[in-house]
């Protein structure tokens, strides 16, 4: 009944930075050429949503509907869409996979150039957004906007998933869990029998721990200032736990002493340039690999050149190195086959109306993942 019509639905709108989100009725346009309109069933709340709201530089990125870790059902498709049918289960992707650009054609990267990100760093341009509220254009965040009952996404930024997948759980594969798991498996390429350190035990860090464990690491050192996170890290395979506040010497020295000179692989899952440096310097010279996973663009990152000259490698990872259309369905299948944990990340469930409570929980480190229901 909704096909071909503008849909009025509920969404959480961020009218300006540093203010609570407001539940509004918005209008969601029909999908244009090559676009898909998706009924969002559930969405996680990710730290990157908070980053845009509270810390990001992009003050012109408002009003906006945040959310980029969602799952839903195809409601309708625009002209030229052949890959998707109404009723199919999908996960919208904040990194597209057009399949045609030189990045998509290379196995080395997932950095597709066809997506929204070439217009601006974090929101769709006003001409691309399909949302309006109270007569104003409302921007779409990371090309997705899952804090809305309906959203419109280009078909190159949608992954089709197993019809048996529970949407209120696999939504986490739209960002956090895939990001951390893939950083270990795809980017760091953690080796069996290796020693790893993971800095920051939010959902991304815990997923990185799970990735290290899945890759066969024999020792996984979990590092966090909040010791409450250590029990959870154990569930995902961590073997050792370090709280930097318990030590007077730098954390890199603590880890170096624990591991006979340094770890083989480290993953920074915080988004703090000081921690990034510590993660690199915790690696063993000669072959240690450190991966930046946590997101920030507010400061420069630095280290002494000898750290790299001595054979360490510094890498970055976005969305776990997964090409979305290929990787997300595989991760969903891995979950259904019980090879990847998801339920253990979910500490809270609430309706969309409680989105500000979910944001507060994350801001104060009181949750791993909160899943919002949009039904």
UniProtKB/Swiss-Prot annotation:
It is found in: Cytoplasm. The keyword Metal-binding applies. Its cofactor is Zn(2+). SUPFAM superfamilies: GroES-like (SSF50129), NAD(P)-binding Rossmann-fold domains (SSF51735). The keyword Metal-binding applies. It is an enzyme of class 1 (oxidoreductase). PROSITE patterns: ADH_ZINC. It holds the Pfam family ADH_N. Zn(2+) 1 binds at residues 46, 68, 175. One of its GO terms (cellular component) is cytosol. Functionally related to class-I mammalian enzymes, but structurally related to class-III. Belongs to the zinc-containing alcohol dehydrogenase family. This is Alcohol dehydrogenase 1. It comes from Gadus morhua subsp. callarias (Baltic cod).
């Amino acid at each position: 009944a909704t096909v071909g019509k503008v849909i009025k639905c509920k969404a959480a709108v961020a009218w300006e930075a540093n203010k609570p989100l407001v539940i509004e009725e918005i209008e969601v346009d029909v999908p244009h050429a090559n676009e898909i309109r998706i009924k969002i069933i559930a969405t996680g709340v990710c730290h990157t949503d908070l980053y845009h709201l509270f810390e990001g530089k992009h003050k012109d990125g408002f009003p906006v509907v945040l959310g980029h870790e969602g799952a839903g059902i195809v409601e309708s498709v625009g002209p030229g869409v052949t890959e998707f049918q109404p009723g199919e289960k999908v996960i919208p992707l904040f990194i597209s996979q057009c399949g045609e650009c030189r990045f998509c054609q290379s196995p080395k990267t997932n950095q597709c150039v066809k997506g929204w990100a070439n217009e601006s760093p974090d929101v769709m341009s006003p001409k691309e957004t399909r949302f309006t509220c109270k007569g104003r254009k409302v921007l779409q965040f990371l090309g997705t906007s899952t804090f809305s009952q309906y959203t419109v996404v280009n078909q190159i930024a949608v992954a089709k998933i197993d019809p048996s997948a529970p949407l209120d759980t696999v939504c986490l594969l739209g960002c956090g869990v895939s990001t951390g798991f893939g950083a270990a498996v795809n980017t760091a390429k953690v080796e069996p029998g290796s020693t790893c350190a993971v800095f920051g035990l939010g959902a991304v860090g815990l997923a990185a721990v799970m990735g290290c464990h899945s890759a066969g690491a024999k020792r996984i050192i979990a590092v966090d200032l909040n010791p409450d996170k250590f029990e959870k890290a154990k569930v995902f395979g961590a073997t050792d736990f370090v709280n930097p506040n318990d030590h007077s010497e730098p954390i890199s020295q603590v880890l170096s002493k624990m591991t006979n000179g340094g770890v083989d692989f480290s993953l920074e899952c915080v988004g703090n340039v000081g921690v990034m440096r510590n993660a690199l310097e915790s690696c063993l010279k000669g072959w240690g690999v450190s991966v930046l996973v946590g997101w920030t663009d507010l400061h420069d990152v630095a280290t002494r050149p000898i750290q790299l000259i001595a054979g360490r490698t510094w890498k970055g990872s976005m969305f776990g190195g997964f090409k979305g259309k290929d990787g997300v369905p595989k991760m969903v299948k891995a979950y259904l086959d019980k090879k990847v944990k998801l339920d253990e990340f979910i500490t809270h469930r609430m309706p969309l109306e409680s989105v500000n409570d979910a944001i507060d929980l994350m801001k104060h480190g009181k949750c791993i993942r909160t899943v919002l229901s949009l039904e």
